[in-house]
Amino acid sequence: MTLSKALEKHKWWCPTSLLLSSNHFVALVLVPLLQNPLEVNVACNICPKKLQYIIFKNPLLSKAFIPSKVGFEMIDRVSQEEGIVLNTIQSKALIGIGSIGEVPVVLAKPQSYMNFSGESVGPLAAYYQVPLRHIILVYDEMSLPNGILRLQPKGGHGHHNGVKSMMKHLDGRREFPRFCIGIGNLPGTMDMKAYLLQKISDTERKQVDAALDQGVEAIRTVVLEGFGSRISRFNIGQKYKYHKV
């Protein structure tokens, strides 16, 4: 579906949510109001632009899975499950337009490196008039064990340069949800860049796949129901997983 067709089909929709995926890059999701504005509980002026999921992907990355790609893989899983094709460039990002359930979304992956990923996020959020609290950032987290998820309604940058860039281009604000996927910490004195770009073991790959499968369901829940208490069900039975409010 082209952007123009999506805008025509959903011209009465108004953007209210934004989901971004940031590993060493950032991916982004935009979600409009539901037919019944009360279901979203947010004030938003009707806007002629259409909102979909947006996914950005850096073409310089290898096809092999490496820790720093886990955020992009999360968005790729969403695009595969929801049948959203990424075929348009906007604001230095590769975007795909479709829907999750009955909610039109834009999946996005910035084409720039991590330190500059906010250059895509800021303009997209402004263009689609997305409230800050409806921006969902998905990214890798070294402070969490491999394959462990963490969901928060807001937070700081945690020394993550991709998140820093995003906050910079959102006027320094931090009140947007985060969806972190653990990639484990540095073993010993290993160089960080080497660690982030190394191929992972089969065991670690299985852990990540399980997290991605669970993450797709979590994102779908957030898009359709909001970032509420039901998200905690994705954290059951795992010591390091938690829904922090």
What is the predicted function of each stretch?
Residues H160:
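Hydrophobic secondary-structure segments that place a key small or acidic residue at a functional site
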Residues T2-K154, K164-F179, L186-D191, D209-D213, ...:
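Nucleotide and nucleotide-moiety/phosphate-recognizing core
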Residues H157:
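Conserved TIR/SEFIR loop-to-helix hotspot centered on a Trp-containing motif
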Residues T189-Q207:
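Short, electropositive alpha-helical surface patch
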Residues K241-V245:
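Acidic, Ser/Thr-rich low-complexity intrinsically disordered segments
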